Curated annotation (Swiss-Prot):
Keyword Thylakoid included in the entry's annotation: no
Similarity comment: Belongs to the multi antimicrobial extrusion (MATE) (TC 2.A.66.1) family. MepA subfamily.
Induction or repression: Repressed by MepR.
Role this protein plays: Multidrug resistance efflux protein involved in transporting several clinically relevant monovalent and divalent biocides and the fluoroquinolone antimicrobial agents norfloxacin and ciprofloxacin. Required for transcription of agr and RNAIII and involved in the production of protein A (spa) and toxins alpha, beta and delta.
One example GO MF annotation: antiporter activity
Transmembrane regions listed in the UniProt entry: 26-46, 54-74, 97-117, 139-159, 170-190, 194-214, 245-265, 282-302, 318-338, 355-375, 397-417, 418-438
Cellular component aspect of the GO annotation: plasma membrane
Full protein name: Multidrug export protein MepA
Places the protein is found: Cell membrane
Length: 451
């Protein structure tokens, strides 16, 4: 295994190495966005913009649940990988058990502190009038499924951590497939509308979590679901949370950004929220593919920063070129068939026109957004956790003043363009931070090989 890793780090063609490290991550991130696409796609057949808005308004809550999953999934997953590299299989059982039951406990806490306040939370998210009840109903199902949603994110990360990316993809594919089957049955067959969409996603997450649990119980001797092993110590907590907290923070700030944006859009009516919801789901496809690409090559870039800076530069060039190709293809698609893409989700012409405009603007930020992902990953890989944390905070902080200024100057059009402006500023900030820290970047290459 070590020789194979060294081959991809040092000798394989750059593109082959890039795909080896990135493809599983790209597929995983791509599948994760399909959940939201499915819900809006099927709800769109009901031709009710209030329902589309209700689903769109819940995006920040989903980001928070994902963040709670990443707290243990990313944090413990990377720790488990290091333990396996050190042949410390026994300790990995304790880490996995604690993280699994810690995630379940977090999910139960989410139910207790949110379910009684679903209406109030829906209002905070920006729901008004008829949309308020629909959003609240969707949130209730989401909150009740929180333990399984969090568990799903944790176990999916564990599958990757132990070197079973195919198991991760099978679990996600099965979940998406089940959602495709359940959504039309629950939404139309049982006439549950928004609640049906929420139930379809919830049941799919439950099924996926159970799939992973059964797999680990039968096939893994390094991931344990035995609650008796859920005994944390100071070292374990430190190793999990020093990586998990930044991952959690990034997801939380993503949700906060979505919340602030929803509040601005709410001033311009239901159609503005629905339009953004559709365009956001569409732009997520290439955005998450690029995110997976950038996160996947982090070990490759980090290793060659120390071992072969020429190869590192070639990798960075290859990633930037790949981002550029994705950007050109997506922009071409948006400007040629963007109207038809949006039309798959609604027949309301006002929403179609607005969503198409938003899609063009947000897709235009894809190139700089991708470069921002790449440079943030470089900061993480080369030991600059503080720089990466600063970037995560900036992503949430920059958008707020930009929104206020652009909204005051140009109204709804300004709110939409603020997305492109904020992404551009974040990308420039990432490049500046990397430049300023260029002489301080260090990495432990032995950890990369072992992990």
């Amino acid at each position: 295994m070590k020789d194979e890793q060294l081959y991809y780090f040092e000798k394989s063609p750059v593109f082959k190495a890039m795909m080896h490290f990135s493809l599983p991550m790209m597929i995983g991130t791509l599948l994760s966005v399909i959940y939201g696409i499915l819900n809006i796609y099927f709800i769109g057949f009901l031709e009710d913009s209030h329902m589309i808005s209700a689903i769109s308004l819940t995006l920040p809550v989903f980001a928070i649940l994902m963040g709670l999953g990443n707290l243990f999934g990313v944090g413990a997953g990377t720790y488990i990988s290091r333990l396996l590299g050190a042949k410390d299989y026994s300790k990995s059982k304790f880490v996995s058990s604690f993280s699994i039951y810690g995630g379940i406990a977090l999910g139960l806490i989410v139910i207790l502190v949110t379910l009684p306040f679903s209406d109030q939370i829906a209002a905070i998210l920006g729901a008004r009038g008829e949309t308020l009840a629909l959003t609240s109903n969707y949130l209730k199902v989401m909150f009740l499924s929180a333990p399984f949603v969090i568990l799903f994110f944790i176990l999916e990360q564990f599958a990757r951590a132990i070197g079973a990316p195919m198991v991760s993809m099978i679990g996600m594919l099965a979940s998406v497939g089940l959602n495709i089957i359940l959504d039309p049955i629950l939404i139309f067959g049982f006439d549950l509308n928004v609640v049906g969409a929420a139930l379809g996603t919830a049941i799919s997450n439950v099924a996926a979590a159970l799939f992973f649990i059964i797999y680990f119980m039968k096939n893994s001797d390094v991931v344990s679901v035995n609650i008796k092993l859920a005994k944390p110590n100071k070292e374990m907590l430190s190793e999990i949370f020093k990586i998990g907290i930044p991952a959690f923070l990034m997801s939380i700030l993503m949700g906060f950004t979505g919340l602030v944006l929803n509040l601005f859009l709410a001033h311009y009516g239901n159609f503005a929220i629905a339009s953004y919801g559709i365009s956001f789901r569409l732009v997520q496809f290439p955005e998450l593919i690029i995110m997976g690409l950038c996160e996947g090559v982090v070990p490759l870039i980090a290793y060659n920063f120390m071992a072969n800076k020429g190869r590192m530069k070639d990798v960075i060039k290859a990633v930037i070129m790949s981002i550029g190709v994705i950007f050109v293809v997506c922009m071409s698609a948006v400007f040629t068939i963007g109207h038809h893409m949006v039309g798959l989700f609604t027949t309301d012409q006002a929403i179609v026109e607005m969503a198409t405009f938003i899609l063009k603007v947000t897709m235009a930020s894809l190139l700089l957004n991708g470069i921002g992902f790449l440079f943030t990953g470089m900061l993480q890989a080369t030991g600059q956790g503080r720089g990466a944390t600063i970037m995560a905070i900036l992503q949430g902080a920059i958008i707020i003043p930009v929104l206020f200024i652009m909204n005051a100057l140009f109204g709804l059009t300004g709110v939409i363009w603020s997305l492109l402006i904020a992404e551009s500023l974040c990308a420039l900030a990432a490049m500046l931070i990397v430049y300023l820290l260029r002489d301080r970047l260090t990495v432990d290459t032995s950890e990369l090989i072992e992990g």
